[in-house]
Amino acid sequence: MEYSIRQEQQRVVAGFHMVGPWEQTVKQGFEQLMMWVDGRDIPAKEWLAVYYDNPDEVPAEKLRCDTVVTVEPGFQIPANSEGVMLTQVSGGEYAVASARVVNHDFATPWYQFFGSVLADTAWEMAAKPCFERYLNDGNQDGYWDIEMYIAVSRRAG
C-alpha cells in the first residue's frame, strides 16, 4: 500500500472513549458523537477514530478507541454533554495512507497499511495511538473514504 510520511500538528479533540469490540463500539461512538455534535451545534472540523490497542494482542472486549471531532484550541465542552471528553491527538511524524472502505470492512486496509509500514527499512512504528480521518459520510454514500495515520520514527542505523 502506498503511503507518505507527514508531519502532523497536535489536534484538540472532543468526543467519546469506548471500550469493547471495535465493530460495535466505533459505530456506537459515532452515533453518540453525531447526536452530540448536531444537538449542540459543535463546530466540528474533522471526524476521527483513534485506536489505542493491537487487536491481535488485546481481547476484543478490552479494545479501546475514541470517536471524536477536532475542535479549536480553548474549546469548552457545553453543559449537559454527559460522557464527552476533551483531549489531544499527538502531533509528530505519521505514515499516512488513503483507502476506500466498502461493506464496513475497515480491517483489510488497516492490515495492508500495517504490513507496508512494518516492511519499511527507513521508518518504524512509534508507541502512539493510530487514527483514521473520515473524508465523507459513509452512512449516506455507502462507502467511506478515509486517511489512516500510524505514528512513526526513523529507524536507528
Curated annotation (Swiss-Prot):
Q: Where in the cell is it found?
A: Cytoplasm
Q: Which molecular function GO terms apply here?
A: DNA topoisomerase type II (double strand cut, ATP-hydrolyzing) inhibitor activity
Please classify the protein's predominant subcellular localization into one broad category: cytoplasm
Q: Name the source's superkingdom.
A: Bacteria
One Gene Ontology cellular component annotation held by this UniProt entry: cytoplasm
What's in the keyword line of the UniProt record? Answer: Cytoplasm, Stress response
Provide the coiled-coil residue spans: none
InterPro entries, per database record: AraC_E-bd (IPR010499), DNA_gyrase_inhibitor (IPR050908), DNA_gyrase_inhibitor_GyrI (IPR024911), GyrI-like (IPR029442), Reg_factor_effector_dom_sf (IPR011256)
Family recorded in the similarity comment: Belongs to the DNA gyrase inhibitor family.
This molecule's function is given as:
Inhibits the supercoiling activity of DNA gyrase. Acts by inhibiting DNA gyrase at an early step, prior to (or at the step of) binding of DNA by the gyrase. It protects cells against toxins that target DNA gyrase, by inhibiting activity of these toxins and reducing the formation of lethal double-strand breaks in the cell.
Assembly with partners or alone: Interacts with DNA gyrase.
Q: Name the chain's protein.
A: DNA gyrase inhibitor
